[in-house]
Amino acid sequence: KYNGRGTFFELGQNMNLYPDIVKSVYERGHEIASHTYQHAQLPKLDATALDEEIKKTQEACFKACGTEPTLVRPPYGAKNDTVKSAFYSYGLSMILWDGDTEDWRYSKVTNGAQIVCDNIIRDAKAKTGDGNIVLIHDIHENSVAGLEMALDQLSKEGYQFVTVSDLLKYKGHSEYK
């Protein structure tokens, strides 16, 4: 609709539950990335559990889309050297964000969609230069509605919407922290 694409950092357990939705999103040109399997606090896991979080998500994505993710966003942004090494062992580049809309706070608020819209616009414009990564969750109705409103306004202002991989290529980076 806005001639753009996005990156969806998906939980492996959700990819297993809803493979048709994941495949549909992927086939429409969006990027599917890893958010690990169950949204665990990764630095608190032992090496075996950490490996399972990553491996099971890679497998779930391959099963749904026919391809494995190359990007990962650790739940809560929580990471340490062990987590980073585990990601790298799977060839995953770790991605964080520039702006957190905190959309989960407004999931049940009457004017939540407008608040989320305002936060998306604020975060999209927060840094000078080209390209920001804005954290939004696709599981809340107010987030989806707020995103639609923000995309409408930002597209009228000339903003473009690209996948994280495309942004990284443009900026000449392999990761975004």
Model-predicted regions and their roles:
Residues 9-13, 36-37, 73-78, 97-100, ...:
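Active-site-proximal beta-strand/loop segments in catalytic clefts of secreted hydrolases
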Residues 1-69, 149, 153, 160, ...:
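Active-site beta->alpha N-cap acidic-glycine motif
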Residues 22, 32, 79-81, 143, ...:
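A broad, structure-centric signal for solvent-exposed, well-ordered loop/edge residues
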Residues 18-19, 42-47, 68-71, 107-109, ...:
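Low-complexity, flexible helical/coil segments
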Residues 1-6, 130-177:
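Terminal accessory/targeting
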Residues 22, 32, 116, 133-134, ...:
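Hydrophobic aliphatic residue packing
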Residues 27, 40-67, 78-130, 143-146:
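Alpha-helical scaffold elements lining the catalytic groove of polysaccharide deacetylases
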